[in-house]
Amino acid sequence: MTINLILLSLLAYVIGSIPSGLWIGKFFYKKDIREFGSGNLGATNSFRVLGIKAGSIVTVMDILKGTVATLLPFFFQLHVDHHFWLLTGAFAIIGHSFPLFAGFRGGKAVATSAGVILAYAPLLFVAALIIFLLTLKISKYVSLSSMIAALAALLISLFMGDWILIILIACITLFVVWRHRANITRIRNGEEPKIKWM
C-alpha cells in the first residue's frame, strides 16, 4: 500500500509537471511564454500572451492536472482513506509549481490547486470560483482575485471540520500569496495589468 501511494504521488508530480502554457505556446503560437508578459508559465500569463482561447485551454488543462492527480487513488482502486487523495493532489501542485519538464520554473499553483479542490470538495470549489469571478468582475485583477479566492476557500474550509483539508488549503493560500508578492507590489503601485475581456 505504501509503495503504491509513493508511486501514485510520483505520477501525480509528473502530471502536475506538464507545462500546459509552455507547450501550447510553443506548438501552436511559436512563442515561449516565459519570454513575454510576467514570464510565468501559468494560465494568467497564457491569457496575456496567447489570448483568450489559448488561455482558456491552459486554464482547463491546469485544473484537470489537479483533478486527475487527486483522483489517482480512485482510478487505480487503491483502497485508502480519502485524505490520501489530498496527498496525490499536493504532489500535482508541487509539480505545477516546480515542473520537471520546464526547468522547475512553473506557475503560481492557482488553477491546479483549484483542480484538487474540485476533485475533493466540489461545493468548496464552486464557492471559491464564484468569489473569484465576482472579485475579477469588480477589480479586473486576476492576481488579486486569485488571492481572495484562496483566502475565501480557507475561511470556508474552517467550517467543514476536515482538518487535513484545512491544513492543505492553508499551505496553498500561503504559497499563492507568496508567489504573487510581485503582483501585490504592482497593485500597490498601480502598475498591475487589468483584464479587458470581462
From Swiss-Prot:
Which of the seven top EC classes does this enzyme belong to?
transferase
What are its GO biological-process terms? phospholipid biosynthetic process
Primary localization class, coarse: membrane
Keywords attached to this entry: Cell membrane, Lipid biosynthesis, Lipid metabolism, Membrane, Phospholipid biosynthesis, Phospholipid metabolism, Transferase, Transmembrane, Transmembrane helix
**Is Lipid biosynthesis there in the keyword field?**
yes
EC number(s): the record gives 2.3.1.275
Name the InterPro entries for this protein: G3P_acylTferase_PlsY
Q: How the protein sits in the membrane?
A: Multi-pass membrane protein
Q: Where does the chain cross the membrane?
A: 5-25, 56-76, 84-104, 114-134, 158-178
Q: In which pathway does it act?
A: Lipid metabolism; phospholipid metabolism
One GO molecular function term?
A: acyl-phosphate glycerol-3-phosphate acyltransferase activity
What role does this protein play?
A: Catalyzes the transfer of an acyl group from acyl-phosphate (acyl-PO(4)) to glycerol-3-phosphate (G3P) to form lysophosphatidic acid (LPA). This enzyme utilizes acyl-phosphate as fatty acyl donor, but not acyl-CoA or acyl-ACP.
PANTHER family under this entry? Answer: GLYCEROL-3-PHOSPHATE ACYLTRANSFERASE-RELATED, INNER MEMBRANE PROTEIN YGIH
Subunit and interaction comment? Probably interacts with PlsX.
Which NCBIfam families does the entry mention? glycerol-3-phosphate 1-O-acyltransferase PlsY (TIGR00023)
HAMAP family named in the record: PlsY
- Name under which the protein is recorded: Glycerol-3-phosphate acyltransferase
What is the species listed in this Swiss-Prot or TrEMBL entry? Listeria welshimeri serovar 6b (strain ATCC 35897 / DSM 20650 / CCUG 15529 / CIP 8149 / NCTC 11857 / SLCC 5334 / V8)
Q: Which gene encodes it?
A: plsY
